[in-house]
A protein has these predicted regions:
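N-terminal glycine-rich phosphate-binding loop and ensuing alpha1 helix
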Residues: 2-61
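Residue-level signal for inorganic ion chemistry
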Residues: 9, 35, 92, 105-106, ...
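Conserved N-terminal catalytic core of the sugar/cofactor nucleotidyltransferase
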Residues: 36-99
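Residues at the starts of beta-strands that form the adenosine-phosphate
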Residues: 49-51, 129, 195
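Conserved beta-loop-beta/alpha segment of the NTase-like Rossmann-fold superfamily
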Residues: 76, 83-146, 160
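A recurrent flexible, glycine/aromatic-enriched loop bordering the glycosyltransferase active site
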Residues: 149-159
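Conserved alpha/beta core of the MobA/IspD/sugar-nucleotide pyrophosphorylase nucleotidyltransferase superfamily
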Residues: 157-221
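Hydrophobic packing residues within well-ordered alpha-helices of enzyme cores
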Residues: 18, 42, 63-64, 120, ...
């Protein structure tokens, strides 16, 4: 029997680098908030997914009002974001039962496709913990003292979201105390001793972080 699917969309960031009144996840691109573009990719999957959006209390009324006005997303869960991404995801897991599959995705990664999401869920069903990653293509340098030294980019990968897990694995992993090294869910799971798997990501599955990224989103969405 296949596990029920959940998507935890992390949208609690303040977006200070955007120089905008609204956090970046709420900025309109092609007539819709960036967050809506992201959520729609999950809603377009063939297999239904329960939507959980983690956001700051400050913007919950804004989002609820937008959904009502736009007749969008009648059913969703809206936990409160925490002090860090780790704590935000931990809050969301209170709404996910054991025996499910849970994808954790950045609310400002709108370029995933339903087909790509489906593949990640299917892989996680088999292995328990999976994330997409892409090789680095730019030359990289490591900061060293007052200067920099070249680094071998073939030794590194850029890890993306969504990262998909058996819910009981992710819940147990999030029972650990917070560590500053926990920059994504895969790191939390690996630190807890669970095996992980990386699969080929999408080069264009970028995280919208800067005004320049926003210009890219405007061109592609």
């Amino acid at each position: 029997m296949e596990r029920k699917r959940y998507a935890v969309i992390v949208a609690a960031g303040s977006g200070t680098r955007m120089n905008s009144k609204l956090p970046k996840q709420f900025i309109e691109i092609a007539g819709k908030p960036l967050l809506r573009h992201t959520v729609e990719k999950f809603l377009a999957m063939d297999v239904p997914v329960e939507i959980i959006i983690v956001m700051s209390d400050e913007y919950k009324d804004w989002w609820k009002s937008y959904c009502r006005r736009s007749d969008f997303l009648e059913k969703y869960i809206l936990p409160t974001g925490g002090f860090t991404r780790f704590h935000s995801v931990k809050n969301a897991l209170e709404y996910v039962p054991d025996g499910a599959l849970v994808a954790v995705h950045d609310g400002v990664r709108p370029f995933v496709t339903p087909e790509f999401l489906e593949g990640l869920f299917e892989e996680a069903e088999k292995c328990g913990a999976v994330a997409p990653a892409v090789p680095l293509v730019e030359s990289i340098r490591e900061m060293s003292g007052d200067g920099t030294v070249p680094a071998d980019r073939s030794r590194f990968l850029s890890v993306q979201t969504p990262q998909v897990f058996h819910s009981e694995i992710l819940r147990k992993a999030y029972g650990q105390s917070y560590d500053t090294s926990f920059t994504d869910d895969l790191t939390v799971v690996q630190k807890a001793g669970f095996p992980i798997k990386l699969v080929a990501g999408l080069r264009y599955n970028v995280k919208i972080t800067t005004p320049e990224d926003l210009e890219l989103a405007e061109a592609l969405l």
